[in-house]
From Swiss-Prot:
Signal peptide: 1-20
Keywords tagged on the record: Cleavage on pair of basic residues, Disulfide bond, Neurotoxin, Secreted, Signal, Toxin
Domain note: The cysteine framework is VIII (C-C-C-C-C-C-C-C-C-C).
Propeptide intervals in chain numbering: 21-26
Predominant localisation class: secreted
Expression (tissue specificity): Expressed by the venom duct.
Post-translational modification note: Contains 5 disulfide bonds.
Organism: Conus caracteristicus
A GO MF term: toxin activity
Cellular compartment(s): Secreted
Protein name: Putative conotoxin
Biological function: Acts as a neurotoxin.
Amino acid sequence: MKLFMFAAIIFTMASTTVRAEQCANNRKVCTWDGQGDTNCDCIGTACHEDDAHKVSVAGSAFYTCQPISAFRVCDGSEDVMDAGFSELYCRCSGGSYTISNGEVVCD
């Protein structure tokens, strides 16, 4: 019985740790088009479905850990997202994104 309780505590701690780390990086993309990691822990918001966290790129919706307004504006010479579409680096001032040569750029 003691072994079972110990294992249950360890399992609970591990799963809590994983959830807490899910959004340690505020640039992380939580979900895209309703798929992906819906376990992002965002304080005070439903970051995996809240429009304040949403970026639309070529008909696909990406939701980030922090609100889009919290990102700095892209300067035009840098990548907007990483190649795997898993992190947003900056936001486009006009809020319009597109894909050019396989990369996300401001439209």
